[in-house]
């Protein structure tokens, strides 16, 4: 089979030929039909400081994908051969204090597909059976491939007291920020403001936002106060940008909620008393997806048609054109890029 792998501690990935793996006890073999490139995959491609500290080549990359169950290992009762599945990328231990208290999304021993073990940029991949989410067979594979990152957006929007009837600021209009705008709109939030300095991506938020803000052209805090009269009740932070985090926190009304998924590339400084404590701000750190609550919430939105993820899929390319695909995403002129492992 063909697979896209990190073979050496250096920039880039390589298209390789490997034997089709066999599922062991509790595992399934998935025939991958669609895979999506994530920002994490770009870090692995670039071989930046994070990748150098985490990735151990050789490794087949990719953690956003969908496919069909081709075979099952001993002891597997579900899913069954022929099922259409999306994959939860976090493989958890079930034994640590986080898992034993139901917080599987912050398992202390998490292994991530395409990061810590072989992932889905391949024609076939073996995964734990418990990591498969079975979809209706009429759900397009390319949409099924991005249910995993969609779960990050759902987790962020529904954390804390939710967003229904509340004013919301979304900082960062990357794929997950755009997905969050969709979820917030479908969940009764309003007004919704979306801020991002990339005009291409910001435009994708137009159907779901009451106000778009390019912080390079407008004063974000001034716009927030003009639209809301005082500030927003909820901040959904996806950028990881230090300035955006500071502005987002100060855009909150006293007593507001900050839900932060974006990860800064370096440690940041902020005024704990002035930005958080004395204003009574409740902050939530968002990691992954709650298993399996987030999947149930997210698929309910997608299966019912309340959220349509397909407009975010801007490019579809064969796996053989992976260099072009990664270049598109790195350019900022794409949202979700889908790879077809069979082509």
From Swiss-Prot:
It is an enzyme of class 1 (oxidoreductase). Binds 2 Zn(2+) ions per subunit. Pathway: Amino-acid degradation; L-threonine degradation via oxydo-reductase pathway; glycine from L-threonine: step 1/2. Zn(2+) 2 binds at residues 93, 96, 99, 107. One of its GO terms (cellular component) is cytoplasm. The record marks 148 as: Important for catalytic activity for the proton relay mechanism but does not participate directly in the coordination of zinc atom. Keywords: Cytoplasm, Metal-binding, NAD, Oxidoreductase, Zinc. GO terms for molecular function: L-threonine 3-dehydrogenase activity; zinc ion binding. Zn(2+) 1 binds at residues 38, 63-64. GO terms for biological process: L-threonine catabolic process to glycine. Its main location: cytoplasm. The active site is at residues 40, 43. NAD(+) binds at residues 176, 196, 201, 261-263, 286-288. It is found in: Cytoplasm. InterPro entries: ADH-like_C, ADH-like_N, ADH_Zn_CS, GroES-like_sf, L-Threonine_3-DHase, NAD(P)-bd_dom_sf, PKS_ER, Zn_alcohol_dh. It catalyses: L-threonine + NAD(+) = (2S)-2-amino-3-oxobutanoate + NADH + H(+). Its cofactor is Zn(2+). Its EC number is 1.1.1.103. The keyword Transport does not apply. Homotetramer. Belongs to the zinc-containing alcohol dehydrogenase family. NCBIfam families: PRK05396.1. Catalyzes the NAD(+)-dependent oxidation of L-threonine to 2-amino-3-ketobutyrate. This is L-threonine 3-dehydrogenase. The lineage of its organism: Bacteria, Thermotogati, Deinococcota, Deinococci, Thermales.
């Amino acid at each position: 089979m063909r697979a896209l792998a990190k073979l050496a501690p250096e920039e880039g990935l390589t298209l390789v030929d490997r034997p089709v793996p066999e599922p062991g006890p509790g595992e399934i073999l998935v025939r991958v039909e669609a895979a999506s490139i994530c920002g994490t995959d770009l870090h692995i491609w670039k071989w930046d400081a994070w990748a150098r500290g985490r990735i151990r080549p050789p490794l087949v990359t990719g953690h956003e994908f969908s496919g069909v169950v081709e075979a099952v290992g001993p002891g597997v009762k579900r899913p069954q051969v022929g099922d259409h599945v999306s994959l939860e990328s976090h493989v958890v231990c079930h034994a640590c204090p986080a898992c034993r208290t139901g917080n599987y999304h912050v398992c202390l021993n998490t292994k991530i597909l395409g990061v810590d073990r072989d992932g889905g940029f391949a024609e076939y991949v073996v995964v734990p059976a418990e990591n498969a989410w079975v979809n209706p067979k009429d759900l397009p594979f390319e949409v099924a491939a991005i249910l995993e990152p969609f779960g990050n957006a759902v987790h962020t929007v529904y954390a804390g007291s939710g967003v229904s009837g509340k004013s919301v600021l979304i900082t960062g209009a990357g794929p997950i920020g755009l997905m969050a705008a969709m979820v917030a709109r479908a969940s009764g939030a309003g007004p919704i403001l979306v801020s991002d300095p990339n005009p291409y991506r910001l435009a994708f938020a137009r159907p779901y936002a009451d106000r778009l803000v390019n912080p390079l052209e407008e004063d974000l805090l001034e716009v927030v106060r003009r639209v809301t009269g005082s500030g927003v009740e909820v901040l959904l932070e996806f950028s990881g940008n230090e300035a955006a985090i500071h502005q987002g926190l100060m855009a909150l009304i006293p007593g507001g909620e900050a839900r932060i998924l974006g990860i800064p590339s370096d440690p940041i400084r902020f005024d704990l008393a002035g930005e958080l404590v004395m204003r009574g701000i409740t902050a939530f750190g968002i990691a992954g997806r709650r298993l399996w609550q987030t999947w149930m919430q997210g698929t309910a939105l997608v299966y019912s048609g309340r959220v349509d993820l397909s407009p975010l899929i801007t490019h579809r390319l064969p796996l053989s054109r992976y260099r072009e695909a990664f270049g598109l995403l790195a350019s900022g002129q794409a949202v979700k890029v889908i790879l077809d492992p069979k082509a």
